């Protein structure tokens, strides 16, 4: 049981005692004693609080002169009369003599105080600038700069004081004279005003500047005369250059800057350095990444890197789609350009890349033209270094003994000391008959790299219908499809294949023999009639085009087998029993003649079929296309 926060425990209050009234007087006395004690404590606390409130009210009455009604009074007590205490003496600013000053609004007073504060700060800045300008051990340049800083500080102070005077005059306040600084920068002992001092400093600065400029023009300066200098002679910054001169030196933006061109000795230098280098920096095309074989000692022939990126091209068939063209080997050559110099630069950049087996595929092919018209020859290269200097395939001086080497199917590589380089330039001796390029991709379909168009003469117009073949490859001997003599050599002994290499020879246009006069008339003959063929009249379907890709891979595998030493010697390709006659007598004779000129004397057998390719030979697969209907 709880009574005003007090608990009555069981010993003091029990049910039988409450019921029967046996202990009632004792319980009542205890409860009354507790309540009285509590009342006495509360009364004491209340009296203390009332005394505090009384003091506060009396203090308020002394300030206001009136006793507040909240002041506690004893019963029957009258309100006390309290006299107002006089106010304490406080330090107030002296009243301004002008009565208009008391009528300023708070905004005007704040603006006036801010302007006066700014003037005071600027006075301190001017005094510090004067002390720095008068410091000893200063050379001419430092003294001139500090004088200039002092003049600027004084000019700013003069402007602020003018603003303060105008503002006070507008408010009707008396204009105050500028207070003198401790160092006497504004008003010195003689009473020189600010304007006079500012004019003197400006005149001194002009005189000092003219003296320094005259000394710099005559070749002398204050820095050479005084021992204390800001910068040593070797560390002083160079004078600023004109903007036009800076643009002429820097070349402007990187897009307009002329590309860096290495000297000819670096471009046509050592074959080893060219083998490990990327494309020439003057090449507008992208450089090809180097294969991993260059870091392995080239024990295994490098895999040709085929790019599908876009870039300038020298020749591209018109009817061939750009995506299909970008996948071919000739996509690394580029489109034709009207400028012969740009064609030569692009061709050189494309042929100075990694010298792999794909470099042998970079032959001059058709540019723009009709379906049957042979492509126009490229512009003759200008005089200069040879355009094509491959380190593996093409050489200007082959060995006279035709034999198979470890890298090409043509003549063996000349020794490294005999190869053309910048250290030992090639001497122009008696003209020799150079051999044709080796390492042809024999099963690469010819219709991929030939132009297609709507107009012009095709095979159907140049050959009889039974002799028109289907989609064939170079392995079938169709390099000599058109009748005519073997490759025509120029008077100086240069080959049509290597004509673009020699800068001193001009491209010789020859008419293909064996054609009718009306077919020959008006045709632009390719520089190499042996490698050019009109396109087939039948476009192979998608399935055969996929087979042509397999044939291209087969040619690459043949190249690997020949160069890795797996093939002991040339073997004759076996004839399958179910295959009929391969070629007509005309085609057989021409193929034999071309094979003899390309791969050696008749005693040697043609190139072997790939050992890793399980399909029948190409001649067997396309045997029906060569037979007379």
Swiss-Prot record:
Sites bearing Phosphoserine, chain numbering: 355, 357
Residues in coiled coil: 109-173
Domain of life from the UniProt record: Eukaryota
Modified how: Ubiquitinated; interaction with CYTH2 may prevent ubiquitination.
Modified residues (Omega-N-methylarginine): 432
Keyword Transcription regulation: no
UniProt cross-references to Pfam families, sorted A to Z: CUPID
This protein's UniProt keywords: Cell projection, Coiled coil, Cytoplasm, Cytoskeleton, Developmental protein, Endosome, Methylation, Phosphoprotein, Ubl conjugation
Record region (Involved in CYTH2-binding): 31-70
Swiss-Prot/TrEMBL GO biological process terms: microtubule anchoring at centrosome; protein localization
Renumbered residue ranges of the record's region Disordered: 209-356, 399-432, 602-629
Regions of compositional bias (Polar residues) in chain numbering: 323-332
Subcellular location per the Swiss-Prot or TrEMBL entry: Cytoplasm, Cytoskeleton, Microtubule organizing center, Centrosome, Centriole; Cytoplasm; Cell projection, Neuron projection; Cell projection, Growth cone
Keyword Cell inner membrane: no
InterPro entries xrefs: CCDC120/INAVA (IPR043447), CUPID (IPR021774)
GO-annotated cellular components: centriolar subdistal appendage; centriole; endosome; growth cone
Oligomer and partners: Interacts with NIN and CEP170; leading to recruit them to centrosomes. Interacts with CYTH2; this interaction is direct and stabilizes CCDC120, possibly by preventing ubiquitination.
Name of this protein: Coiled-coil domain-containing protein 120
The species this protein was found in: Mus musculus (Mouse)
